[in-house]
């Protein structure tokens, strides 16, 4: 009987140590598919939010979505945490890398862009993306790989 209890306990310890990746995330972060996520309520502009995320954990950044399932998880997390709001994600046009072309197919050689850059946010009510000036304030979600 003692041997059975000992072996059962051993299997339980092994099972618990191998199950789930939630243990890889800090206790106040949420885990999904090997990544850790946390919404933050203090509004920041896009650059300050990205900088803040890099300081939270090694490899941290504003959230980036690799699938609709991941986006659904993060949108639900943001809504459950703060209700209706908008949240920055890591997508932006800060470096103005768009390949613009004139309607007559001529290459864009002369540029006179305003200093405004645009960054992407999502609403916590759906996972539809929108852009706005990066200088605007919004809540945000940080992410790092567990």
Curated annotation (Swiss-Prot):
Keywords: Blood coagulation cascade inhibiting toxin, Calcium, Disulfide bond, Hemostasis impairing toxin, Metal-binding, Secreted, Signal, Toxin. Residues 24-146 form the C-type lectin domain. Ca(2+) binds at residues 64, 66, 70, 143. InterPro entries: C-type_lectin-like, C-type_lectin-like/link_sf, C-type_lectin/snaclec_domain, C-type_lectin_CS, CTDL_fold. Residues 1-23 form the signal peptide. Disulfide bonds join 25-36, 53-142, 119-134. It is found in: Secreted. It holds the Pfam family Lectin_C. GO terms for molecular function: calcium ion binding; toxin activity. GO terms for cellular component: extracellular region. Expressed by the venom gland. Heterodimer with subunit A of IX/X-bp or IX-bp; disulfide-linked. Belongs to the snaclec family. Calcium is required for ligand binding. When linked to subunit A of IX/X-bp, anticoagulant protein which binds to the gamma-carboxyglutamic acid-domain regions of factors IX (F9) and factor X (10) in the presence of calcium with a 1 to 1 stoichiometry. This is Snaclec coagulation factor IX/factor X-binding protein subunit B.
């Amino acid at each position: 009987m003692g041997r059975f209890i000992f072996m059962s306990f051993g299997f339980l310890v092994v099972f618990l140590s191998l199950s789930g990746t939630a243990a890889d995330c800090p206790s106040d972060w949420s885990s999904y598919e090997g990544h850790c996520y946390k919404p933050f309520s203090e509004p920041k502009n896009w650059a300050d939010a990205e900088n803040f995320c890099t300081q939270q954990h090694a490899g941290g950044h504003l959230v980036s979505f690799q699938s609709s399932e991941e986006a659904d998880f993060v949108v639900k997390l943001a809504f459950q945490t703060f209700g209706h709001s908008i949240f920055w994600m890591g997508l932006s046009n800060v470096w103005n890398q768009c390949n613009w072309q004139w309607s007559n197919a001529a290459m864009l050689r002369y540029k006179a862009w305003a200093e405004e850059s645009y960054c992407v946010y999502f609403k916590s009510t759906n996972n539809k993306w929108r852009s706005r000036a990066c200088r605007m304030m919004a809540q945000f979600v940080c992410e790092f790989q567990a």
